């Protein structure tokens, strides 16, 4: 069952700039969304990535091979480069829910993208994805492989503590203090920082900043063309307008008002098939 407090991570510049972009929003199995787009030959495949606290697994399907990449959250606005002449299919995990290959820690992928062996997530996975008919079939195939990996994981004390902290951060729009989390859990501030960083690769304070920013992106996106970004910012955990503007410029590279106009123009052009909510239960038994 989907947690109503979960904020699905948004990468707006893919939606705005990528060719033939399509995504399926889900929130199931620790997955935020599946997405696809093309980078044609001779076309620069560079987009801007924003902080989202999540991890993305991307398959670049070419005529001769399939390349696999995994990347964690960026720490501020950063270029995200893709090889031209490939179709890309990706899955974005919810924060704290990423499934990493053996031998790779979350710290290894924060603020970077790593190319990994094509068989890291299972034999024949990339071949099956390359031969699939479309994004929904690819999502079903990938879920099958990921589910086998996830079932082997046991929820221990550390993951339960992290889950509690993450849910409290969501519920308070990123405004709960580390001191309050320490009092609520009974663990020291130093210990809960260490546990959180072990699972997310970033500190609770950084994660809270990203959650406030992502909540604001979602609010602006839901109200594209209607204004009210300042009011939305206050409801997303920011102390004041100055606080909001500083983070937004650092993370989005623009102002909330200019971003709202970009989203508004896209909303006027967007094909309803570009973005859909998973109503078919991808990955559910």
Feature annotation, model-predicted:
Residues 207-210, 242:
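Conserved structured core elements
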